[in-house]
């Protein structure tokens, strides 16, 4: 019998991770709710639509809209109406976001290291493989 359910352990790690991230990103005006995930994807794919953000990050539309609005108000992104679909917005990073990108990546890398610092390289590879294996959605 397991000491603790796997879901509970994953939830605990997620909450701890989010708490640390929120604290590290707050000075830059980036809040919780996955804003860093949205910004990272927008930096990787300038001109992505809000719908694509929703689908790729697997957030609901309301969370996407709220995060995009907050990132826009903080000056990290800009939204423009999609010329091919007037009901859709294209989201791109601003100069502020491009300048912040290495800082964001550094924070995320540092956090990742802190999560696995007690593991050997083999254990880290194994846990990544196992988490990816159980996170695959059978409906996709």
Description of each model-found segment:
Residues 1-28:
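N-terminal leader segment of winged-helix/HTH proteins
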């Amino acid at each position: 019998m397991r000491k603790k359910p796997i879901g509970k352990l994953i939830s605990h790690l997620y909450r701890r991770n989010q708490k640390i991230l929120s604290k590290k990103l707050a000075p830059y005006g980036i809040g919780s709710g996955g804003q860093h995930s949205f910004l990272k994807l927008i930096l990787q794919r300038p001109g992505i639509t809000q719908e694509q953000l929703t689908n790729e990050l697997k957030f609901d539309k309301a969370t996407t809209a709220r995060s995009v609005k907050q990132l826009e108000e903080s000056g990290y992104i800009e939204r423009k109406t999609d010329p091919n679909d007037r009901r859709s917005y294209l989201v791109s990073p601003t100069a502020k976001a491009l300048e912040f990108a290495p800082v964001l990546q550094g924070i995320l890398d540092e956090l990742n290291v802190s999560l696995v610092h007690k593991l050997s390289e083999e254990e880290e590879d194994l846990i990544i493989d196992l988490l990816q294996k159980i996170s695959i959605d059978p409906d996709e």
